[in-house]
Amino acid sequence: MKDEHNQEHDHLSQKEPESYQKACACKEQQGEEKQEASEKECEIKEDFELKYKEMHEKYLRVHADFENVKKRLERDKSMALEYAYEKIALDLLPVIDALLGAYKSAAEENKESALTKGLELTMEKLHEVLARHGIEGIECLEEFDPNFHNAIMQVKSEEKENGKIVQVLQQGYKYKGRVLRPAMVSIAKND
Protein backbone atom coordinates (compact mmCIF):
# COMPACT_ATOMS: atom_id res chain seq x y z
CA MET A 1 0.00 0.00 0.00
CA LYS A 2 2.83 2.20 0.74
CA ASP A 3 4.14 1.51 -2.65
CA GLU A 4 0.90 2.46 -4.16
CA HIS A 5 0.84 5.63 -2.19
CA ASN A 6 4.42 6.43 -3.20
CA GLN A 7 3.68 5.69 -6.78
CA GLU A 8 0.68 7.94 -6.64
CA HIS A 9 2.69 10.65 -4.98
CA ASP A 10 5.47 10.26 -7.55
CA HIS A 11 2.90 10.36 -10.25
CA LEU A 12 1.46 13.62 -8.78
CA SER A 13 4.83 15.18 -8.38
CA GLN A 14 5.60 14.39 -12.00
CA LYS A 15 2.31 15.92 -13.02
CA GLU A 16 2.87 18.99 -10.92
CA PRO A 17 5.83 20.26 -12.84
CA GLU A 18 3.96 19.65 -16.06
CA SER A 19 0.91 21.60 -14.87
CA TYR A 20 3.20 24.19 -13.35
CA GLN A 21 4.95 24.53 -16.67
CA LYS A 22 1.61 24.85 -18.39
CA ALA A 23 0.56 27.51 -15.89
CA CYS A 24 3.80 29.39 -16.42
CA ALA A 25 3.44 29.09 -20.16
CA CYS A 26 -0.13 30.27 -19.84
CA LYS A 27 0.98 33.22 -17.75
CA GLU A 28 3.69 34.05 -20.28
CA GLN A 29 1.16 33.82 -23.05
CA GLN A 30 -1.20 36.04 -21.09
CA GLY A 31 1.65 38.46 -20.48
CA GLU A 32 2.44 38.52 -24.19
CA GLU A 33 -1.25 38.96 -24.98
CA LYS A 34 -1.46 41.79 -22.46
CA GLN A 35 1.61 43.38 -24.00
CA GLU A 36 0.14 42.99 -27.49
CA ALA A 37 -3.18 44.36 -26.23
CA SER A 38 -1.35 47.24 -24.57
CA GLU A 39 0.54 47.96 -27.80
CA LYS A 40 -2.72 47.83 -29.76
CA GLU A 41 -4.33 50.16 -27.24
CA CYS A 42 -1.42 52.58 -27.65
CA GLU A 43 -1.73 52.43 -31.43
CA ILE A 44 -5.49 52.98 -31.22
CA LYS A 45 -4.98 55.83 -28.77
CA GLU A 46 -2.35 57.48 -31.00
CA ASP A 47 -4.59 57.04 -34.04
CA PHE A 48 -7.53 58.52 -32.12
CA GLU A 49 -5.45 61.49 -30.94
CA LEU A 50 -4.23 62.13 -34.49
CA LYS A 51 -7.76 62.01 -35.87
CA TYR A 52 -8.97 64.22 -33.03
CA LYS A 53 -6.29 66.82 -33.83
CA GLU A 54 -7.21 66.73 -37.54
CA MET A 55 -10.92 67.13 -36.77
CA HIS A 56 -10.22 69.90 -34.28
CA GLU A 57 -8.11 71.77 -36.85
CA LYS A 58 -10.88 71.35 -39.44
CA TYR A 59 -13.40 72.62 -36.91
CA LEU A 60 -11.27 75.69 -36.18
CA ARG A 61 -10.89 76.45 -39.91
CA VAL A 62 -14.61 76.02 -40.57
CA HIS A 63 -15.44 78.16 -37.55
CA ALA A 64 -13.04 80.88 -38.72
CA ASP A 65 -14.56 80.74 -42.22
CA PHE A 66 -18.03 81.00 -40.71
CA GLU A 67 -17.03 84.04 -38.65
CA ASN A 68 -15.48 85.69 -41.73
CA VAL A 69 -18.63 85.09 -43.78
CA LYS A 70 -20.75 86.40 -40.93
CA LYS A 71 -18.66 89.59 -40.69
CA ARG A 72 -18.73 90.08 -44.46
CA LEU A 73 -22.52 89.68 -44.55
CA GLU A 74 -22.92 92.16 -41.70
CA ARG A 75 -20.64 94.63 -43.51
CA ASP A 76 -22.54 94.14 -46.79
CA LYS A 77 -25.85 94.62 -45.00
CA SER A 78 -24.56 97.77 -43.34
CA MET A 79 -23.31 99.11 -46.69
CA ALA A 80 -26.61 98.26 -48.37
CA LEU A 81 -28.53 100.11 -45.69
CA GLU A 82 -26.11 103.03 -45.76
CA TYR A 83 -26.41 103.47 -49.50
CA ALA A 84 -30.11 102.58 -49.79
CA TYR A 85 -30.99 106.16 -50.77
CA GLU A 86 -28.46 106.23 -53.60
CA LYS A 87 -30.77 104.70 -56.23
CA ILE A 88 -33.71 106.93 -55.40
CA ALA A 89 -31.37 109.94 -55.32
CA LEU A 90 -30.17 109.10 -58.83
CA ASP A 91 -33.80 108.86 -59.96
CA LEU A 92 -34.57 112.26 -58.40
CA LEU A 93 -31.70 114.13 -60.09
CA PRO A 94 -33.58 114.75 -63.38
CA VAL A 95 -36.57 116.06 -61.38
CA ILE A 96 -34.28 118.43 -59.47
CA ASP A 97 -32.75 119.55 -62.78
CA ALA A 98 -36.23 120.24 -64.20
CA LEU A 99 -37.21 122.27 -61.12
CA LEU A 100 -33.98 124.24 -61.32
CA GLY A 101 -34.56 124.90 -65.02
CA ALA A 102 -38.12 126.08 -64.33
CA TYR A 103 -36.85 128.37 -61.57
CA LYS A 104 -34.15 129.91 -63.79
CA SER A 105 -36.65 130.44 -66.60
CA ALA A 106 -39.22 132.04 -64.27
CA ALA A 107 -36.52 134.20 -62.62
CA GLU A 108 -35.43 135.55 -66.03
CA GLU A 109 -38.97 136.70 -66.77
CA ASN A 110 -39.88 138.09 -63.36
CA LYS A 111 -37.78 137.53 -60.26
CA GLU A 112 -40.51 138.83 -57.95
CA SER A 113 -43.39 136.72 -59.29
CA ALA A 114 -45.23 134.26 -57.06
CA LEU A 115 -44.21 131.40 -59.37
CA THR A 116 -40.52 132.27 -59.05
CA LYS A 117 -40.75 132.56 -55.26
CA GLY A 118 -42.71 129.29 -55.04
CA LEU A 119 -40.12 127.45 -57.14
CA GLU A 120 -37.33 128.96 -55.05
CA LEU A 121 -38.96 127.79 -51.79
CA THR A 122 -39.59 124.34 -53.29
CA MET A 123 -35.93 124.05 -54.30
CA GLU A 124 -34.78 125.13 -50.83
CA LYS A 125 -37.04 122.58 -49.11
CA LEU A 126 -35.96 119.83 -51.50
CA HIS A 127 -32.28 120.57 -50.84
CA GLU A 128 -32.93 120.56 -47.05
CA VAL A 129 -34.56 117.12 -47.26
CA LEU A 130 -31.78 115.78 -49.47
CA ALA A 131 -29.11 117.16 -47.11
CA ARG A 132 -30.85 115.50 -44.15
CA HIS A 133 -30.37 112.17 -45.93
CA GLY A 134 -26.73 112.79 -46.90
CA ILE A 135 -27.33 114.03 -50.45
CA GLU A 136 -25.71 117.35 -51.26
CA GLY A 137 -24.70 119.41 -54.25
CA ILE A 138 -21.10 119.45 -55.39
CA GLU A 139 -19.51 122.85 -54.95
CA CYS A 140 -18.20 124.37 -58.12
CA LEU A 141 -15.98 127.18 -56.94
CA GLU A 142 -12.84 128.14 -58.80
CA GLU A 143 -10.75 124.98 -59.02
CA PHE A 144 -11.59 122.18 -61.42
CA ASP A 145 -11.41 118.78 -59.70
CA PRO A 146 -11.81 115.75 -62.00
CA ASN A 147 -13.07 113.74 -59.02
CA PHE A 148 -16.14 115.98 -58.76
CA HIS A 149 -16.35 117.85 -62.06
CA ASN A 150 -16.72 116.82 -65.68
CA ALA A 151 -15.36 119.39 -68.16
CA ILE A 152 -17.79 119.51 -71.08
CA MET A 153 -16.08 122.34 -72.92
CA GLN A 154 -13.25 124.80 -72.77
CA VAL A 155 -13.93 128.50 -73.30
CA LYS A 156 -11.84 131.65 -73.49
CA SER A 157 -12.20 133.78 -70.42
CA GLU A 158 -10.42 137.00 -69.58
CA GLU A 159 -11.63 136.80 -65.99
CA LYS A 160 -10.49 133.23 -65.21
CA GLU A 161 -7.10 131.52 -65.38
CA ASN A 162 -6.51 128.35 -67.39
CA GLY A 163 -8.20 125.31 -65.88
CA LYS A 164 -10.57 127.32 -63.67
CA ILE A 165 -14.33 126.71 -63.76
CA VAL A 166 -16.14 129.32 -65.83
CA GLN A 167 -19.72 128.07 -65.76
CA VAL A 168 -21.75 125.23 -64.22
CA LEU A 169 -23.87 123.61 -66.93
CA GLN A 170 -25.42 120.91 -64.73
CA GLN A 171 -25.27 120.65 -60.94
CA GLY A 172 -23.44 117.62 -59.57
CA TYR A 173 -24.43 115.70 -56.44
CA LYS A 174 -22.78 113.40 -53.95
CA TYR A 175 -24.22 110.97 -51.42
CA LYS A 176 -22.32 110.58 -48.16
CA GLY A 177 -19.15 111.76 -49.85
CA ARG A 178 -19.53 109.47 -52.87
CA VAL A 179 -20.20 111.13 -56.23
CA LEU A 180 -23.67 110.38 -57.60
CA ARG A 181 -23.19 112.56 -60.64
CA PRO A 182 -20.27 114.88 -61.36
CA ALA A 183 -20.99 118.53 -62.06
CA MET A 184 -20.89 119.37 -65.78
CA VAL A 185 -18.77 122.49 -66.18
CA SER A 186 -16.96 124.60 -68.72
CA ILE A 187 -13.37 125.56 -67.94
CA ALA A 188 -11.15 128.40 -69.06
CA LYS A 189 -8.59 127.91 -71.80
CA ASN A 190 -6.78 131.10 -72.76
CA ASP A 191 -3.98 129.80 -74.99
Curated annotation (Swiss-Prot):
Keyword Mitochondrion tagged: no
Alphabetical list of Gene3D superfamilies matching this protein: 3.90.20.20, Head domain of nucleotide exchange factor GrpE
Biased composition (Basic and acidic residues): 1-19, 29-42
Protein location: Cytoplasm
CDD domains: GrpE
GO molecular function: adenyl-nucleotide exchange factor activity; protein homodimerization activity; protein-folding chaperone binding; unfolded protein binding
GO CC terms, sorted: cytosol
Keywords: Chaperone, Cytoplasm, Stress response
Annotated spans, Disordered: 1-42
A Pfam family reported for this protein in Swiss-Prot or TrEMBL: GrpE
One GO-annotated biological process of the protein: protein folding
Keyword presence, Transcription: no
Subunit structure: Homodimer.
HAMAP family recorded: GrpE
Family indicated by similarity: Belongs to the GrpE family.
Main function: Participates actively in the response to hyperosmotic and heat shock by preventing the aggregation of stress-denatured proteins, in association with DnaK and GrpE. It is the nucleotide exchange factor for DnaK and may function as a thermosensor. Unfolded proteins bind initially to DnaJ; upon interaction with the DnaJ-bound protein, DnaK hydrolyzes its bound ATP, resulting in the formation of a stable complex. GrpE releases ADP from DnaK; ATP binding to DnaK triggers the release of the substrate protein, thus completing the reaction cycle.
Protein name: Protein GrpE
Natural source organism: Helicobacter pylori (strain HPAG1)
